[in-house]
């Protein structure tokens, strides 16, 4: 395994070759984001989604319901993890991110890489954790709240036990890589680096309603919480040229279901 890891340049957090150093900290330091995070504009109307995309190609993906985390890698190694916080300032949780179930500690790419993704706790893990709690009042209300607390632990041994998964959904900074001016290419490239990437598809306005329907049909069987979809322009240069409003980036939009389709049962 060590030889394979050396050959690929990829070492996952759950690899037996990784010696995890558990650490207890007194507080989580706060840090300003190099690239502030704006919220997305939202719609519940598929027609509005189609109009928004117009003649462009877009990438549609899950809007996962956990805690957004920004990971930074340098020289192939994770050097920092920060929560979204208020979009301007987040909490540094590097020790905790290193024990997420599926995050690579080392990647083949050696330049500076900054990515965003969602830390989530799967329904199956959420239910298993709740089953061990006998007092009904003490049970966790939903996977999102449990995930938020798990990611922001002062003791990363607890984070490890909660089996937090990370799904990459955006590449913020990757120097000296030709991404062919394509957001889809960026996501596929992240997958090649060893990241679990949010499920996504390239689409156009004519295929978009069917894609939305296909996603909606998967909700009840998904093992991870989501609260809608995200549609992002595939053309990176065009997306950047649109800039932002005071509140939202113009290169992406969120689609919310009319009602939450999957409910978590507390027993």
Stretch-by-stretch model annotation:
Residues 1-267:
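RNA/tRNA-interacting regions in translation and RNA-turnover enzymes
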């Amino acid at each position: 395994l060590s030889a394979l890891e050396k050959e690929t340049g990829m070492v996952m957090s759950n690899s037996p070759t990784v010696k995890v150093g558990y650490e207890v900290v007194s507080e989580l330091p706060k840090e300003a984001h190099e690239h502030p995070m704006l919220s997305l504009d939202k719609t519940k109307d598929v027609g509005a989604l189609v109009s928004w995309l117009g003649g462009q190609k877009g990438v549609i993906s899950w809007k996962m319901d956990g805690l957004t985390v920004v990971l930074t890698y340098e020289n192939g190694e994770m050097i920092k993890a920060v929560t979204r916080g208020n979009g301007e300032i987040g909490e540094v949780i590097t020790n905790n991110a290193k024990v997420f179930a599926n995050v690579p500690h080392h990647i083949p790419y050696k330049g500076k890489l900054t990515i965003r993704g969602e830390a989530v706790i799967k329904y199956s893990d959420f239910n298993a954790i709740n089953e061990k709690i006998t007092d009904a009042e003490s049970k966790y209300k939903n996977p999102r709240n449990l995930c938020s607390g798990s990611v922001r632990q002062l003791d990363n041994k607890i984070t490890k036990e909660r089996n937090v998964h990370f799904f990459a959904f955006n590449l913020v900074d990757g120097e000296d890589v030709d991404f062919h001016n394509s957001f889809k290419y960026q996501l596929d490239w992240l997958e090649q680096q060893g990241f679990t990437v949010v499920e996504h598809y390239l689409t156009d306005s004519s295929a978009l309603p069917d894609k939305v329907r296909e996603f909606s049909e998967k909700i009840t069987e998904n093992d991870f919480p989501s609260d809608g979809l995200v549609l992002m322009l595939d053309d990176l240069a065009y997306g950047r040229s649109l800039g932002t409003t005071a509140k939202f980036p113009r290169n992406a939009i969120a689609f919310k279901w009319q009602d939450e389709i999957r409910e978590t049962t507390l027993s």
